[in-house]
């Protein structure tokens, strides 16, 4: 199990559970700061992050209908290899959204981050722990 400290958001001054996550697609890799969001249904990948990984928007065909603040935003489902710290890489499914990272951050939600990892939040201590699922 790996322990993380909340990161203070510059705009709001509020602690947020952020992790550095390495994403891989083929030979291309990218490390993103992702919000571990137990209230999010899906993992979200901003447009520019997908483009950096070599994804081509026009080649996608698995349409995702989004709700909430992303309702009406065009999105496609993509599967990427992801690695958190020293843990073994796993496959995560993302809704790749047509919004840049300046408008939406990478989110790790119920499908399927919380199916691959056990997450424990200790909000009063501004700490959270993550461990790969037991096999």
Indicate residue ranges for each PLM-predicted region:
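Pepsin/retropepsin-fold aspartyl endopeptidases
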Residues: 1-135
């Amino acid at each position: 199990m790996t322990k993380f400290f909340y990161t203070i958001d510059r705009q709001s001054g509020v602690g947020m559970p952020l992790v550095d996550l390495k994403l891989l697609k083929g030979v291309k890799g990218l490390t993103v700061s992702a919000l571990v969001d137990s209230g999010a249904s899906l993992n979200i990948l901003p447009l520019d992050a997908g483009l950096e990984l070599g994804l081509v928007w026009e080649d996608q065909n698995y349409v995702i209908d989004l709700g909430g603040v992303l309702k009406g935003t065009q999105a496609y489902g993509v599967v990427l290899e992801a690695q958190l710290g020293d843990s073994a890489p796993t496959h995560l499914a993302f809704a790749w959204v047509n919004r840049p990272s300046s408008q939406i951050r990478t989110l790790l939600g119920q499908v399927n981050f919380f199916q691959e990892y056990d997450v424990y939040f200790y909000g009063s201590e501004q700490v959270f722990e993550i461990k790969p699922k037991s096999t």
